[in-house]
Amino acid sequence: MRLLSCLALVITSAVLPAQDFDFKGVPADYAIVFATASSRGLKISDSPEAKAFKARMEKTLAGLDPSTKDSKEMQEAIKAATGIDLESPDNRIAGGVTLGAAGQMSGGLIVRTRHDSKKLSAHAVAKKVSTLQAGATKGWNGQELLASLSDELAKAAKDFPTPATAPGAPASEPIGVFDLDDNTLVIAQPKEAARIIDLLKGKGTSYALNASLRPQVNATGRPYAVFAMNAAKLPATPELSDSGFQGAIFAMGENGSNQIMKISAFFTSKEKAAPMAMQAQGMLAMAPMMLAGDPSKPETAEEKEMKALAAEFLAGVQPVEAAGNQVTLTAKWDTLKLFGMLEKIVAIGATKAKAAPQPLTK
């Protein structure tokens, strides 16, 4: 959990128009790809309301978990060592994964953020971080580099993902951080990083968002995050073949005062798409009944509030659309109301945590 919190800080970002999502460097053979863009000017993250919301959330979380008080110090430590401003609205990421038939997974992450390459190198050398090589590009052991940045990140580094290897196979390469230039970091195992770096230098063809998917992304207004899956690049199974599933796309965007989410799944035919449309619409129809609960049992104030929040959230979800071989789910939430919902959920969680029995200390 600590690692996830730290990584969330490191890759915080969001948006430009869909055509400006930068997939350069992402291998075209990845089954799953994702990207974000600059969040500059967005109400969800780069507005007075967003900053006030973030400050309130930080205060609430600090009361719940004292270790979160170290987040500012951690950000400052990262900036001092690398020059990276984690709160810059211009930070962006892109990447993806490919899946093997035996369950093995490989992939990479491209972090586009302004940083000081000389400062990063000097820090890594001073902290004796192990070096790695991706072709002609020098890098550092990701786990060791993370641990060297701050005490809080050193604790998180213990949960750093270790690439799995098959029994009897040679030890897998560690995940590295490779500094391509003052605006680009590549995070991947050395062999994969070398492939990504070649693509960034124009050697080969990178992934490109298919023109048929752009309308779904653009329909969110000003899109700031996209996630796409291509079933043809997934390991073949009879179940996948029978389903007719071809792929899916998820996009988040901002349109005026609203946050828009679109999820579309594509199938080989209208007939193959129909079961998914029916299942999705059925789940939406059942949701209010599930929220109603058992009228014979008394509800606590907390349960009533959580039900009200769930109902408010579901109110933003529109009926499922089925058009030919495509099934689409759309949701729309007012940005300020969304802030309010998230804040209430965290506050309820904090209240429950404080009321829970505390572990005995000697």
Where are these regions (language model features)?
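Sec-dependent signal peptide recognition
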Residues: M1-L9
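One face of beta-strands
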Residues: Y30-F34, I93, G107-V111, Q246-F250, ...
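Solvent-exposed coil/turn segments that connect beta secondary-structure elements
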Residues: A37-S39, R112-D116, D182-N183, P190-E192, ...
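Structural boundary/hinge residues at secondary-structure and domain interfaces
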Residues: Q19-A166, A171, V217-L240, M278-L314, ...
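Hydrophobic h-region of N-terminal signal peptides that target proteins for export
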Residues: L9-P17
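Surface-exposed interaction/gating patches
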Residues: A219-P275
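A conserved glycine-rich beta-strand in the N-terminal activation segment of trypsin-fold
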Residues: P167-D242
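Broad, structure-driven detector of short, well-ordered beta-strand segments within folded domains
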Residues: R92-A101, I175-F178, L240-E254
